[in-house]
Amino acid sequence: APLHPPREMVLERHIRHVNNFGGGPPVIEARWNNALQELAEGSRLGIPIVFGTDPRNANPRSGFAQWPPQLGQAATRDAGLVRELARLANEQQRAVGVRFHIAPMADVATEPRWPRIPGTFGEDAPLCAELIRAYIEGLQGAGGIGPESVICSVKHFPGDGPVVDGFDPHNAYGTYQAYPGGQFEYHLIPFRAALEAGAGAVMTDYAIPLGIDAVAAAFSEKLIAGLLRGEMGFQGVVVTDW
């Protein structure tokens, strides 16, 4: 249950980003989101809420149409198919009022013990890059961000794929990422493609990149201000993971 009533969260605490991961009938979610949006837009400044979600089309409890996660899509090596599935996801998410998509995962899965590999496009960075572009074009639109776009938050910069011993950095024991053979740039290939495709947001990760910085990417001025904003020229939204 929420810590505070929805009316208080919207009108008094001015919450304007809400993540809703589904689990019930989409028609109920649409009514709920519309009710919250009506509260927000009826406030003094009328600033609307941005509703976000993780991918739902590989989660049978979501009430959405079902197809394989990113790894299954990568097995087809068909960028056109990935683009079309993303376009369908756009339609389904907009139907319930969701405009922020917490994906795709641009992590290159070079550590086979990492448990989140099914959510990635695999270990081949050039293939990942090709499919990332298609995914973003399907969700956001090939012509850039517009009225019918669902914004993609590509993750987890600069890449969770090489986590040490496969320990995920969402947990206290998943502290480090390693780049044997100097492969840091290899893991950036899909992220560069995502930015070229116009990704509206980038999500950082919580692992410390060995040999790159002494703090996690989410706290790294070197990686966010220096690399992502500076060298790579990203001007969109940067968010942390949760």
Where are these regions (language model features)?
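Glycoside hydrolase catalytic-domain context in secreted enzymes
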Residues: 1-242
